[in-house]
Curated annotation (Swiss-Prot):
Its main location: cytoplasm. NCBIfam families: metG, metG_C_term, PRK00133.1. Homodimer. The gene is metG. One of its GO terms (cellular component) is cytosol. Is required not only for elongation of protein synthesis but also for the initiation of all mRNA translation through initiator tRNA(fMet) aminoacylation. Binds 1 zinc ion per subunit. Its cofactor is Zn(2+). Transmembrane segments: none annotated. This is Methionine--tRNA ligase. It comes from the Bacteria.
Length: 677
């Protein structure tokens, strides 16, 4: 079915320029690249761009630690990032930096328009200031005791224990992360973006169907809580763009970071001249499509601040946000001590890019679900699907065609109906690629691969080859197998670019989406060479060991759980005494509808019942097994309102996460309500 060619601009979230690309990053870039490659196969004009997010206090401070300038550091990091993405065959049309002249000009333009339209407000605020470093402290550079639940060692913007959000000035006994000094309060004039003015527009955009349901639901929670004015300025010293006519004031990194999408595209337009127009994609009434692939941790900025900034400065809004979850490895968060915090470059020293591209693709859907890279399953799936089902289909037929028929395929299809079954699947598979239901697409393709191999098994060309006078049958059977291989590889082309190149060289033809409607008949293929090698667990073991060695080389030799969760700052006895730990009896435990992580626990404190939501479902798939157990809970934690209800405390557990979560229990004899001292 012929499609009308569309103009599409696709972006990935900008990697921060103070660290290496790891397998968590690669999920997003692979997901976007597969989608982009499919769009290009269908004849659409796609511009695929990215950039390094190169501003902010963390970059300034890390450069100081390294004894180099921020410009030098981000330049070196950009080269490393681009090398990693090229190694995974991410087909960017342009990769730029937010520290660019294009981004400076666009940031100043958007700011000036927002200011002219009355959306920038000035007011004096009190901030924490490090007297030793002579700098105001951003949220994440202050730690102290949570003002809500009194948990120690929490960052200045939100508590990782109770989930509360607050300003750094609300922290109890704050300390500078930079110097360890006790900050002092100091007044400073700041600039604020009037986000509440866009509430009605944003709610209409949310209801338009342009966003994933999970994103729209989360945005509704934010609307109900009320939008707040957004501080878009930071005080010197700061690495970034100085705000026009405001000496010593700089744009907050999250203002110019998304503008980096525009800056990278402007840079591409300037390189290409008249062949692509910036305004055609970014003007208010643009008919081009704009899609941002992002992780679920930055939805707030992309779904609220970014579209509001664009609306207020007379630019177009995104067509959609495509949000994905996190990556876990072997059921737990990536771990430096276990060697599962794997850098992209380390992966490529042990496996090819296509293997990870395939595994991620096979697990991805349009939902915001976390993806688990189970390394044993990875080996089994790559061997079973790519090697045994797809590549083997070509190898078991190519030998006969090359040796007996000089590489020339039969002039007719042996089974036209089977071939039609394969080509008819283009609509379903294409729709799955289009809607980002990648796992479904892979399942459909592998079902066809099973059909193809069943056909070859039933026709048994190795038997026919030994039978006198059946050369025509042999050529027809093997030609059919090779034609089915061609269709499979066409469907997999967005996922496996390097394998596709080798397949195209063997088939002596380019693989195109529409081309499969015409089978290869009387066509000469090239001599067959091995297309893909099997992988094994020894490679996995070497990969994990290499990742461990990198951690040892980069840091002090800390091993075990302490490498992933270092011991927090020393606290006083009085600090600890604020936390009221009690023995609790689990009276009931059940799944929480709508959540794949939470269990709802009913706890008896010896005269008082509590309802607690706990993220331990992955470790306790049978909640009934918890009923009757004693555990330890934080009894004086402030109640927390969640989408599923009110959580009235927190149970204590240990472990890295995933299936390795272990609920703490007291020794026999402890009673509900007993205090832990």
């Amino acid at each position: 079915m012929t499609q009308v060619a569309k103009k599409i601009l696709v972006t990935c979230a900008l990697p921060y320029a103070n660290g290496s690309i790891h397998l968590g990053h690669m999920l997003e870039h692979i997901q976007a690249d597969v989608w982009v490659r499919y769009q290009r196969m269908r004849g659409h004009e796609v511009n695929f761009i990215c950039a390094d997010d190169a501003h902010g206090t963390p970059i300034m401070l890390k450069a100081q630690q390294l004894g180099i300038t921020p410009e030098q550091m981000i330049g070196e990091m950009s080269q490393e990032h681009q090398t990693d993405f090229a190694g995974f065959n991410i087909s960017y049309d342009n990769y730029h930096s937010t520290h660019s002249e294009e981004n400076r000009q666009l940031s100043e333009l958007i700011y000036s328009r927002l200011k002219e339209n009355g959306f920038i407000k000035n007011r004096t605020i009190s901030q924490l200031y490090d007297p030793e470093k002579g700098m105001f402290l951003p949220d994440r550079f202050v730690k102290g005791t949570c003002p809500k639940c009194k948990s120690p060692d929490q960052y200045g913007d939100n508590c990782e224990v109770c989930g509360a959000t607050y300003s750094p000035t609300e922290l109890i006994e704050p300390k500078s992360v930079v110097s360890g000094a006790t900050p002092v309060m100091r007044d400073s004039e700041h600039f604020f973006f009037d986000l509440p003015s866009f509430s009605e527009m944003l709610q209409a955009w949310t209801r338009s169907g342009a966003l994933q349901e999970q994103v729209a639901n989360k945005m509704q929670e934010w609307f109900e809580s009320g939008l707040q004015q957004w501080d878009i300025s930071r005080d010197a010293p700061y690495f970034g763009f100085e705000i026009p006519n405001a000496p010593g004031k700089y744009f907050y990194v999250w203002l110019d970071a998304p503008i980096g999408y525009m800056g990278s595209f402007k840079n591409l337009c300037d390189k290409r001249g008249d062949s692509v127009s910036f305004d055609e994609y970014w003007k208010k009434d643009s008919t081009a499509e704009l899609y941002h692939f992002i992780g679920k941790d930055i939805v707030y900025f992309h779904s609220l601040f970014w579209p509001a900034m664009l609306e207020g400065s007379n630019f177009r809004k995104p067509s959609n946000l495509f949000v994905h979850g996190y990556v876990t490895v072997n059921g737990a968060k990536m771990s430096k001590s276990r060697g599962t915090f794997i850098k992209a470059s380390t992966w490529l020293n042990h496996f090819d890019a296509d293997s990870l591209r395939y595994y991620y693709t096979a697990k991805l859907s349009s939902r915001i679900d976390d993806i688990d890279l189970n390394l044993e399953d990875f080996v089994q799936r790559v061997n079973a699907d790519i090697v045994n089902k797809v590549v083997n289909l070509a190898s078991r037929n190519a030998g006969f065609i090359n040796k007996r028929f000089d590489g020339v395929l039969a002039s007719e299809l042996a089974d036209p109906q089977l071939y039609k079954t394969f080509t008819d699947a283009a609509e379903v598979i294409g729709e799955a690629w289009e809607s980002r239901e990648f796992g479904k697409a892979v399942r459909e393709i592998m079902a066809l691969a099973d059909l193809a191999n069943r056909y070859v098994d039933e026709q048994a060309p190795w038997v026919v080859a030994k039978q006198e006078g059946r050369d025509a049958d042999l050529q027809a059977i093997c030609s059919m197998g090779i034609n089915l291989f061609r269709v499979l590889m066409t469907y997999l082309k967005p996922v496996l670019p390097k394998l596709t190149e080798r397949a195209e060289a063997f088939l002596n033809t380019e693989l195109t989406w529409d081309g499969i409607q015409q089978p290869l008949l009387g066509h000469k293929v090239n001599p067959f060479k091995a297309l893909y090698n099997r992988i094994d667990m020894r490679q996995v073991e070497a990969l994990v060991e290499a990742s461990k060695e990198e951690v040892k080389a980069a840091a002090a030799p800390v091993t075990g759980p302490l490498a992933d969760d270092p011991i927090q700052e020393t606290i006083t006895f009085d600090d600890f005494a604020k936390v009221d730990l009690r023995v609790a009896l689990i009276e009931n435990a059940e799944f929480v509808e709508g959540s794949d992580k939470l269990l709802r626990l009913t706890l008896d404190l010896g005269g008082e019942k509590r309802n607690v939501f706990s993220g331990i479902r992955s470790a306790y798939p049978d909640p009934q097994a918890l009923i009757g157990r004693h555990t330890i809970m934080v009894a004086n934690l402030a109640p927390r309102k969640m989408r599923f209800g009110i959580s009235e405390g927190m149970v204590m557990a240990a472990g890295p996460g995933g299936k390795d979560i272990f609920l703490l229990s007291p020794d026999a004899g402890a009673k509900p309500g007993h205090q832990v001292k």
